[in-house]
Amino acid sequence: MQRAGSSGGRGECDISGAGRLGLEEAARLSCAVHTSPGGGRRPGQAAGMSAKERPKGKVIKDSVTLLPCFYFVELPILASSVVSLYFLELTDVFKPVHSGFSCYDRSLSMPYIEPTQEAIPFLMLLSLAFAGPAITIMVGEGILYCCLSKRRNGVGLEPNINAGGCNFNSFLRRAVRFVGVHVFGLCSTALITDIIQLSTGYQAPYFLTVCKPNYTSLNVSCKENSYIVEDICSGSDLTVINSGRKSFPSQHATLAAFAAVYVSMYFNSTLTDSSKLLKPLLVFTFIICGIICGLTRITQYKNHPVDVYCGFLIGGGIALYLGLYAVGNFLPSDESMFQHRDALRSLTDLNQDPNRLLSAKNGSSSDGIAHTEGILNRNHRDASSLTNLKRANADVEIITPRSPMGKENMVTFSNTLPRANTPSVEDPVRRNASIHASMDSARSKQLLTQWKNKNESRKLSLQVIEPEPGQSPPRSIEMRSSSEPSRVGVNGDHHGPGNQYLKIQPGAVPGCNNSMPGGPRVSIQSRPGSSQLVHIPEETQENISTSPKSSSARAKWLKAAEKTVACNRSNSQPRIMQVIAMSKQQGVLQSSPKNTEGSTVSCTGSIRYKTLTDHEPSGIVRVEAHPENNRPIIQIPSTEGEGSGSWKWKAPEKGSLRQTYELNDLNRDSESCESLKDSFGSGDRKRSNIDSNEHHHHGITTIRVTPVEGSEIGSETLSISSSRDSTLRRKGNIILIPERSNSPENTRNIFYKGTSPTRAYKD
C-alpha cells in the first residue's frame, strides 16, 4: 500500500498495486479521499470549504495564482487586443500608406462588389471564425467531462482546483483556457494582418474602380510618366478607397486559416481512435471551410492570389504556435509529468531486470559454496552429452580461450625438441571456489577426519573403462597457486587478482641421471598479509588446445569422447571421492607406523590401482600438520644433495623412457595422476633430503602420486613424482584439491598462482 499526497500538499490517497502496475498506472489512479470516522475534516480538505461543499471521490488542488493571473494578466491582454482591433478595423484613426500605381492598370481595374453581395462578409467571417471553433470546443469538453466522470475513480480526469473559495472543475477550466486562447489568437491574427496591410498599402484588384483617378490633374501625361505616386482619386467613398489600399495579406484568409488549424489540432488531440472516420471528417471540414473563405476573396476580386496564400501561411502559423505552446497541444496539464514518469519507469525496469537475473544466479550458485564441508562433499553435476556441456548457464559454464588455438598454446616436452622460450599466453579464467580456512592444525585434522568419515560410508565401486589406444587426448599439466583470497561470482566465476602462472620452459630431457644445468626453473611469489584459503577448483569443461594444422586430431578426440562419455554417466561423485572410496575398500589408504594421525592418498589414472606397500622415495610429498613453532613445513624428498634449487628432469632408474613427460603423443593413455596438495606455510622455507621410508615424528598428511605400468597394448601412464626429482621450498597459502571431470577429453590444469621472480627455490 503506497501513500501519496495531492499537489496541494494536504491531501492523502491510497494507491493499491502501485508496485505491480508501475509508475504510469500508479500515477493515473485516482486518489480516493476518505472521511474521518468522527465526521471531522477529511484529508486534502481546503480551509475555505466545508465537508458538504467538497465533492465526493474527487481530488481537489488548492491554487493561489489561478485567479490573480486570470484577472490581472490574461484578461488585460485579451482586452487590449480587442480594443486595438476595434480602432484598426472600425475607425479611421490609422490610415494605410498611399502607394503608387500605374496608369490604367488593368489588374487594379476589376469590378467592385458591394459588401452586402459578398459571399462571406467580414462580420460573418468574425462570427464564424470565433463562434464555430468556440462552440465546438465547449461541446467537445462537455462530452469528454461526462464520459470521464462516469468512469470508475475518474481515471484520466483532471483534478478540481479550489481558488478563492471557488471550486473549478476540469470542464470549466479547460473550456475557458481553450476558448480564451482561441479568442486571443483571432485578435492577434487580425491585428497582425491589419498592421501589415497598413504598412504596405498594397492596392486591391478593384482599387482603380473605387478610386476614380483624375489623370488630367497631373502635370505630365501618363505616356511620359506611367507610374503615379500622387493621390489623384476623385471617388466619394473614402472608406471604400481606404479598404482598397489594404489588400495584402487577405484578412479573410488569415482568420479562416487560424480557426481551421486551431480546431483541427483540438480534434486530433482530444478525439480517440475508436471512430476511425469521425476525426478526419471534422478536420477536413474545417480546413475546407477555411480554404473556401480565402478563395472567395479571389473570385470576387477582393484580393490577389498572393494575398490569399500569404494569409493562409500567417494564420496557420499563429494557430500552430498557440496550439503547441499556449495550450500544450490540448493535453491535460499534468500530461508532461506522465511522460516523464514513463521515462523513469523504463529506466526502473532496465535496472530491476538485471537485479532479478543476478539474484536468481546468486541463489543457484550459492548452494554449493556455503561452507567447507559443502564444497568437499558436493556432488558432481551430471553432464550427459557434449551438447549439455556447451550450454553456459548457472550450472555449467564453458570457458573459451581468449586467443585462437595455435602453436603458442601448446607446450611439448620431448628429448628431441630444442629448447625454446615461447611467450606465455594468458590462460582462460577458471571457475574456482575459494573459502577461508583456519591455520591451526586442529581445524585441518577435523576437516580431513570428517571428510574420511563421510566417504567411508559410500560403498560405490569405481568403474574404470580402458579407452581406445591412440585416441585419448593429451593432458596439459599446469600449476598455479594463489596467495590472495578469491571470491566467487554469481555464476561461480573466479574473481580475484590477475592470473600469475608458474611457467615451466621446456628443456631437453636427459637420458641419464646427470642433472642438467639448463633445466626449467620455478619461482613462486608470496604476497605478505594475504589470508589463507582452501582453494578447490570447480569441475569445468577444459579447452583442448590444438594447432590449426592438427584439426583432424581434435576430431579424433571428440569422437573418442562421444564413445566413452556414456560410460561415465553412472559416476555422479567427484573423481577424488571415488578414488578415496575405492582405496578404502581395497585397504590402500594406510597409516604410517610412526604416525597415527596422518593419512595417505593414492590416485592413479590407469586401469589398475597400485597399493602403497612399496614406498618409492621420490614420489612422496610430506606436509607437516603439527610442526614446531606452529610453522607448517613442506618436505619434499630429493636424492641430490646439491643443486641449483630448480626443477630438474631425470630419466627413470631403469633407463626406460616410458615415463617421460610428453604431452603431444596421441598414443598415450589419457588417464594420469593429477592429485596434488599444497600445505599452509607462514615461516621460512625449509628443505631436507630424507629417505622416503623415514617418517616424521609428527602427524603427516601425505599425497602420493604413484605411476603404474601400462597394459599389454602399450598404454602408459604419465607420472609426476617418478619422472623427475624435484626440490621445492615454497611459502604456500592455499591447499588445492582438484577434482576430476567425467569427460575423458577434459584436462585438469593444476597451477600455482601468485609467483614472484624475486624469491626462488634454494638448496
Swiss-Prot record:
Phosphoserine modified-residue sites = S36, S346, S385, S438, S461, S472, S606
Tissue distribution of the protein: Expressed by glutamatergic neurons (at protein level).
Q: Which GO terms describe its biological process?
A: axonogenesis; G protein-coupled receptor signaling pathway; inner ear development; lipid import into cell; phospholipid metabolic process; regulation of postsynapse organization; regulation of synaptic transmission, glutamatergic; signal transduction
Q: Which domain of life is it from?
A: Eukaryota
Record-annotated membrane-spanning stretches: 67-87, 119-139, 178-198, 247-267, 276-296, 308-328
Record Gene3D superfamilies: Phosphatidic acid phosphatase type 2/haloperoxidase
Tell me the impact of changing T299S.
Found in a patient with infantile epileptic spasms also carrying a SCN1A variant; uncertain significance
The record ties this protein, via InterPro entries, to: P_Acid_Pase_2/haloperoxi_sf, P_Acid_Pase_2/haloperoxidase, PA_PP_rel
Which residues lie in Basic and acidic residues bias regions?
Answer: 669-694
> Which membrane topology term applies here?
Multi-pass membrane protein
Please give one Pfam family short name: PAP2
Instruction: Tell me which residues are glycosylated.
Output: N214, N219, N268, N362, N432, N455, N513, N543, N568
Cell compartments where the protein resides: Postsynaptic density membrane
Segments of skewed composition (Polar residues)? 740-749
Q: Which GO terms describe its molecular function?
A: phosphatidate phosphatase activity
Give positions of region: Disordered. 33-54, 458-529, 669-698, 739-763
Keywords for the protein's UniProt record, in alphabetical order: Cell membrane, Glycoprotein, Membrane, Phosphoprotein, Postsynaptic cell membrane, Synapse, Transmembrane, Transmembrane helix
Q: In this UniProt entry, which cysteines form S-S bonds? A: none
> Which Gene Ontology cellular component terms are annotated?
glutamatergic synapse; plasma membrane; postsynaptic density membrane; Schaffer collateral - CA1 synapse
What this chain does, per the entry, is described as: Postsynaptic density membrane protein that indirectly regulates glutamatergic synaptic transmission through lysophosphatidic acid (LPA)-mediated signaling pathways. Binds lysophosphatidic acid (LPA) and mediates its internalization into cells. Could act as receptor or a transporter of this lipid at the post-synaptic membrane. Modulates lysophosphatidic acid (LPA) activity in neuron axonal outgrowth during development by attenuating phospholipid-induced axon collapse.
Q: Which family does it belong to?
A: Belongs to the PA-phosphatase related phosphoesterase family.
- Name of the protein: Phospholipid phosphatase-related protein type 4
Question: What gene is it encoded by?
Answer: PLPPR4
